Amino acid sequence: MVTSSDQIQNGSEEQSKRSEIYTYEAPWQIYAMNWSIRRDKKYRLAITSLIEQYPNRVEIVQLDESNGEIRSDPNLCFEHPYPPTKTSFIPDKECQRPDLLATSSDFLRLWRISDDESRVELKSCLSSDKNSEFSGPITSFDWNEAEPRRIGTSSIDTTCTIWDIEREVVDTQLIAHDKEVYDIAWGGVGVFASVSEDGSVRVFDLRDKEHSTIIYESGEPSTPLVRLSWNKQDPRYMATVIMGSAKIVVLDIRFPALPVVELQRHQASVNAIAWAPHSSSHICSAGDDSQALIWDISSMGQHVEGGLDPILAYTAGAEVEQLQWSSSQPDWVAIAFSNKLQILRV
């Protein structure tokens, strides 16, 4: 187990570098954050601000491996209307597509990073309501890894919208829930799920847009579900978080209604969850107890007295708002707390 030390103890001396933790301090509180997926930009991340004033900020930062410093490039910093609720780089490991970054707030925006990395330009500003100057805030989005021209967004107006970002048109818009939709996740080319203020996890298949399957309901009236993560290595499993709850609920879509396991070692509300991109049995969580925990759920079918314990723990300096696991480098996890970004070797 690890506390707030300079290294995460994982038992392997060979893996130990000069430091296992790198920290970047932003001039503002960080909210959204994500890793680059491109093979040639493996230590690059985007971070966004949480500022009450209208113009917020987005920075693209990079770890300099030679000296262990995470640096911000002034050419790749830009203003953003309102605080972004999420940011994500295009899922393009092989660098075959334009280098794009997406952000969500009032609209879904796509930003293009120039080939020489000298500037960032707004490529698209997408709104599903063409008749209005304003749009219902977008709470989250997910970029389809199998079909990167598709992005799904969730909104407080109860809808999920599937965008074709190449044609800049709405592919599909569905009334997904009875109340605000807080998160969305793809489970394949044409299948996605969402969670809502109404307390349900629903799965949608784009081949049958009239119907959805309720996989789980929080059980108590007015208990919203706020986060959703779909296991990319084993799409039978997904995980969700109940608003204000210290537990993570893991679901098997083959057996709706009952969780297969509930992970209950956080001491305060969970804010973020992420499945390992390289392992079907590992998931990371982070929350208001300042902890980031990694769990091995391979034994989840068996009864464990007192419940599962995490296999790895890290204590940050404040409540952890954001967590992302690098898909291009699966031994690295990034967390954001207060004005700090940390990348941790796990």
UniProtKB/Swiss-Prot annotation:
Positions of transmembrane segments: none
Superkingdom classification of source: Eukaryota
Residues modified to N-acetylmethionine: 1
Entry keywords, A to Z: Acetylation, Biological rhythms, Repeat, Sensory transduction, WD repeat
Disrupted gene: phenotype observed: Plants lacking LWD2 do not show obvious phenotypic alterations. Plants lacking both LWD1 and LWD2 are early flowering and this phenotype is more prominent under short-day conditions.
Ranges in coiled-coil conformation: none
One BP term from GO: rhythmic process
Induction remarks: Circadian-regulation. Up-regulated y virus infection.
Ranges occupied by WD repeats: 79-121, 133-173, 176-214, 265-305
Biological function: Clock protein essential for the proper expression phase and period length of both the oscillator and output genes known to participate in photoperiod sensing. Required for the expression of APRR9, APRR7, and APRR5. Regulated by APRR9 and APRR7 at the transcriptional level, indicating the existence of a positive feedback loop within the circadian clock.
PANTHER family in the cross-refs: WD REPEAT CONTAINING PROTEIN
Protein name in the entry: WD repeat-containing protein LWD2
